[in-house]
Amino acid sequence: MSDFVQQQNAVCQFSSSDAWVILSPIEQSIKRKIEAVGTPLKDWNINIYRGVLTGYNDAFIISTEKRNEILANCQTEDERQRTAELIRPILRGRDIKRYGYVENGLYLINTHNGIRGKIPRIRIEDYPSIKSHLDQYWDKIEKRADQGDTPYNLRNCAYLDDFSKPKIVWGNLNLKASFALVEDNSFINAPSPMIVPASNYLLGILNSKLADYYIRRLGVTRQQQFALRIG
């Protein structure tokens, strides 16, 4: 073992306070070349956000069948229309593929907590059918840490509007680079992240073999997959 270590050892120098990673000499050389000609994502005019945290997915993430049931239980056409607008498609990390995603038939009950000075929080009293559904989970949603002003509301989210914009999304755990463009108003379930505003140019770079190689060297191994952390 001692001879093997002496033969295979490599010196790694960490000259800054930035995050560091142990690489072979040739890997260090490749990393330096990429970073010398590339522009860090933090210097692009973009934002990287985490997906939605509900605190209790069983209550707030529902199937197509449950969505239809909630809408059918609305007492007026006005309530039905407002309720339909509040229930939005949501993607999970496992649904996201390279340049695309799988329609999963899942929806988020977006009883958001509003944005101060911009959007008022959802008042559950205005959505009786949704309230009836959530009341079935009261013991769970009332105790959860991630909640808004009331147990019916989701936690504060300052970038709520950005979920309605085109965005680049990816799963938190991947075997390879799998970035997709989502152009509709779908939400993303945490811990999956998203980039806004979206760019086809950036999407192509992130899905390239070079970016895949680079991110793999910096990613965190978990469950034989890579937690892709970019920024």
Report residues per predicted region.
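Polybasic, glycine- and aromatic-enriched phosphate-binding surface used to engage nucleic acids
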Residues: D3-G231
